[in-house]
Amino acid sequence: MEKIISGKVYKFGNNIDTDIISPGMTISFGLADGSELEEVRLHAFEELRPGFYKEVIPGSIMVAGKNFGLGSHREQATTVMKKLGFTLVIADSVARLYQRNSFAIGFPVLEVPGISRMVEEGDYIDVDLYNWTLMNKKNNETIKIEPLSEIALKIIYSGGIIELLKETWKQMHH
């Protein structure tokens, strides 16, 4: 993962739950061939924006209001964000379980109160994960953001908790 993430904003409102992100009808709970995640991708966010998967430009950033990711624990609700092509989610507030699940797969999800008022759909933003700043390129407005913990960053930069454990195992046994 890059230290500076830049991308086009796709914006959603408050209370985007895991049923909206990954509709239950698309989840078979067990397909190991990857077809399940593709099915989830085709229906992600369709309750609010039918055909949303066709709109997303790879490398984009999702911005949302309060309570992003609330609801049931679904691995697909986090993995589908990567499958759609997002590099980052930023919301006014994020459900703790959703954020932890995202970190576990190496996907950054940031809580930035007020972000939904700062950017609009289609804006381009830069998020500097070294200096912990966020800039809206439309008007150059820049704000400081709360850094993630060292362990969260380590997990994300490793590509997820499993990859971090593999790295740690190799270091311990070589």
Regions found by a protein language model. Name each.
Residues 1-29, 163-173:
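N-terminal, positively charged, Ser/Thr/Ala/Gly-biased leader segments
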Residues 16, 69-76, 156-165:
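Conserved phosphate/anionic-ligand binding catalytic regions in large, soluble enzymes, centered on
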Residues 4, 61, 149-151:
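Short hydrophobic "helix-edge" motifs at membrane interfaces and signal-peptide entry regions
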Residues 103-174:
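Acidic, glycine-rich flexible loop/linker segments
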Residues 13, 65, 138:
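Pocket-edge structural micro-motifs
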Residues 20-22, 27-131:
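Feature captures the catalytic cores and cofactor-binding loops of soluble hydro-lyases/lyases
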